[in-house]
Amino acid sequence: MARRKNSRYSGIGGQAVLEGIMMKNSEKYAVAVRKPNGEISVELENYQGVLHGSKIKEIPFIRGIFNFIDSMILGMRVLNYSASFYEEEDNAGSAGADRTGGSGEKFVNALVTVAAIVMAVGIFVVLPYFLASLLKGYVRNESLMAIIEGAIRIFIFILYVWGISAMKDIKRLYRYHGAEHKCINCVEKGRPLTLHNVMRSSRLHRRCGTSFLFFVFFVSIILFFFIRVDSVAQKVILRILLMPVVAGISYEIIRLAGRSDNILVLILSVPGMLIQRMTTKEPDESMAEVAIAAVEAVFDWRQYLYDNFGYEVDESWMDGNESSYADQENDADGASDWLEDETADEEPQEWETEDPGEDAEEI
């Protein structure tokens, strides 16, 4: 029998936070955090995003801009929430009383988000331009200058990722990032969401935000080709003004990458997947447990497996009796071939070319 594709789009996405994971499914999101006492705290909330219900968010290339804004806002919110568990003891009481934050905290979060965007634009947009400009005396071709600028931008990003990876908290963040990907890959490959299955799933995923950032750099090289003005100020301003356009195009590419086996898309996905080797690390089982808790809070993976892979989960499989699942898998129509050895699992996943709809989550 010919081997069939065995991955399906699940609609879930998320991010790593301090000692935890945020998972989002449509408008619901859950933050699971391993508290200092070893317990797992799970907070379930709704996030409708900017311009909720507006038809503007359904327009291709425009929707990516608002998706990026939503990701920044929600990302800052859940990072602050997870950090509240590790504040100094004299602040623990007030943090526990209201971890969602009042209007004052929301205002501060908004300022921090804006400051982060400004800093990112300065480091990854403006700085590469001025560094590339130092070579103008040696390179006269504007197109080549745009390529050099893009290469410098990618180099700065890789240097940044590598540099912060030396920090203890970031090392653990990267491991939780790997746990997040493993959970999503586990269910999208049709495996029951058990600790064993999660640990043997891939830590790389094509819809990852790291891959999105690479597409941003790649698209910016192409668009910046067309900036043909003499004024330095105009060149910088045009680059900044084009960034929403770059984000919108990059979002559509990563949506396509998450559901297409087109050879060009696969090739374009490779650099982002390689960079993910730096931004994700192998988690331990305690981290995977946190990721599983976050997924289960927002996603009915048992129903998902039944709808997409055609089998019901036997609770005996959840007790570690994997042979029962193996026997069932041999007989069930549509069950995934999850018993193959994928412990290396650094290869890009197989994907169905079905349309995930407008709620596609970047992870």
Per-range role (PLM):
Residues 1-90:
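Divalent-cation
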Residues 107-122, 201-226:
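Transmembrane alpha-helical segments and their cytosolic interface motifs
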Residues 28, 59-81, 149-174, 247-259:
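Hydrophobic alpha-helical membrane-embedded segments
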Residues 2-13, 17, 21-23, 93, ...:
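Polar-ligand-bearing catalytic/cofactor-coordination segments
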Residues 50-54, 81-106, 330-333:
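Cytosolic regulatory modules rich in charged/polar residues
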Residues 89-137, 141-167:
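Hydrophobic alpha-helical segments characteristic of transmembrane helices
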Residues 81, 85, 119-141, 216-247, ...:
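Juxtamembrane "helix exit" motif at the C-terminal ends of alpha-helical transmembrane segments
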Residues 219, 223-230, 237-293:
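Membrane-interacting alpha-helical segments
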